[in-house]
């Protein structure tokens, strides 16, 4: 693995350990060069309560790797989380910088009713 990826994974591991100690539901984000994925994971980490990505049929038609697509994913995951009875989450950015697509997804999820 490259140093950049190793450093990102180390940041992610440290953040996830803190969230695990607090035992909170988390909104986990992963971004690739072409897509972005979001999952709401239970406090013990054993179950995915809600998920959304640019691979969903609703979102696949438009562009999938830009800020607009991330905003749509954020709104969709917030709707699905609220339907599952989740309103408060911890934001797990998976070691990615809070910038660009990751920030757009977080802002849209907040607008959709999730509290971080």
UniProtKB/Swiss-Prot annotation:
Family that this chain belongs to: Belongs to the universal ribosomal protein uL18 family.
Protein source organism: Pseudomonas putida (strain ATCC 47054 / DSM 6125 / CFBP 8728 / NCIMB 11950 / KT2440)
Quaternary structure, from the entry: Part of the 50S ribosomal subunit; part of the 5S rRNA/L5/L18/L25 subcomplex. Contacts the 5S and 23S rRNAs.
Gene Ontology molecular function, alphabetical: 5S rRNA binding; structural constituent of ribosome
Highest taxon of source: Bacteria
GO-annotated cellular components: cytosolic large ribosomal subunit
Alphabetical keyword list: Ribonucleoprotein, Ribosomal protein, RNA-binding, rRNA-binding
Gene: rplR
Protein name: Large ribosomal subunit protein uL18
InterPro entries referenced in this protein's UniProt entry, alphabetically: Ribosomal_uL18_bac-type (IPR004389), Ribosomal_uL18_bac/euk (IPR005484)
């Amino acid at each position: 693995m490259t140093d950049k990826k190793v450093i990102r994974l180390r940041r992610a591991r440290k953040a996830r350990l803190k969230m695990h100690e607090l035992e909170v539901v988390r909104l986990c984000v992963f971004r690739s060069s072409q897509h972005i994925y979001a999952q709401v994971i239970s406090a013990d980490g054993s179950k995915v309560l809600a998920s959304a990505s640019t691979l969903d049929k609703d979102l696949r038609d438009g562009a999938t790797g830009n800020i607009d697509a991330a905003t749509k994913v954020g709104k969709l995951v917030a709707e699905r989380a609220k339907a599952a009875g989740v309103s408060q989450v911890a934001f797990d950015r998976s070691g990615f910088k809070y910038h660009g697509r990751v920030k757009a997804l977080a802002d849209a999820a907040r607008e959709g009713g999730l509290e971080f």
